[in-house]
Amino acid sequence: MHINDWPTDERPREKLLARGAAVLSDAELLAIFVGSGLRGQDAVRTARDLLHRHGPLRCLLDRPAKALARLPGLGPASACKLSAALELANRHLLSDLERGEALSDPSSVGRYFSQRLRARNYEVFAALFLDSRHRAIAFEELFTGTIDAAEIHPREVVRRALLHNAAAVVVGHNHPSGNPEPSEADRAVTQRLLQALGLVDIRLLDHFVIGDGRPVSLAERGWVP
């Protein structure tokens, strides 16, 4: 059955317009970009097959546009639209931080780190430097490779914070394995940074660990006083 033969309130586009995007399943949202679907399949079925073969959703959407364009059921036009929509969503998410507004929602900072680091297939340790009103000054990737307590140099974080005249710092790093649970090394790094930054009266506000799903905040765990 073609999707146009479905009841109107079950078609993805009509459902989105009537009830909002949040009520659509992953397959229904993807079907809007798929368009007509493969021959003999409706768009939702094609989208489900894409998620089954190339998912989960994050793995599918982290692919560059050229890789998406090669997947059956997408093609160049749909892949470009999908990549453009993702980039617009990322820019919307990051806009408050990047235009210098005060940060009042810690979860938005975690999402910022997630968008910047999640897709990397190697570990990256980054810092967000803030002024005394907790407005973003700069975001920098400081260390890459295998991140452990021996690889993170607090002096470099302090040096960059002083260079930016920062009053506070939020740090974060990704776990390419997808497991965001903080390790003992992550906790050790956090304590070393707290001590080093404290010597120059700069606050460490949080340390986020990025993996699949929601970023883990060490401050929420009580490990950043």
From Swiss-Prot:
Binding site for Zn(2+): H173, H175, D186
Annotated keywords: Hydrolase, Metal-binding, Metalloprotease, Protease, Zinc
Keyword flag Amino-acid biosynthesis: no
BP terms from Gene Ontology: proteolysis
PROSITE patterns according to UniProt: MPN, UPF0758
Listed CDD domains: MPN_DUF2466
Residue ranges constituting the MPN domain according to the UniProt record: 102-224
InterPro entries (UniProt xref): MPN, RadC_JAB, RuvA_2-like, UPF0758, UPF0758_CS, UPF0758_N
Gene Ontology molecular function terms on file: metal ion binding; metallopeptidase activity
Motif, JAMM motif: chain positions: 173-186
Presence of keyword Zinc: yes
Similarity-based family: Belongs to the UPF0758 family.
PANTHER family, sorted: DNA REPAIR PROTEIN RADC (PTHR30471), UPF0758 PROTEIN YEES-RELATED (PTHR30471:SF3)
Stated name of the protein: UPF0758 protein XCC3860
UniProt source species: Xanthomonas campestris pv. campestris (strain ATCC 33913 / DSM 3586 / NCPPB 528 / LMG 568 / P 25)
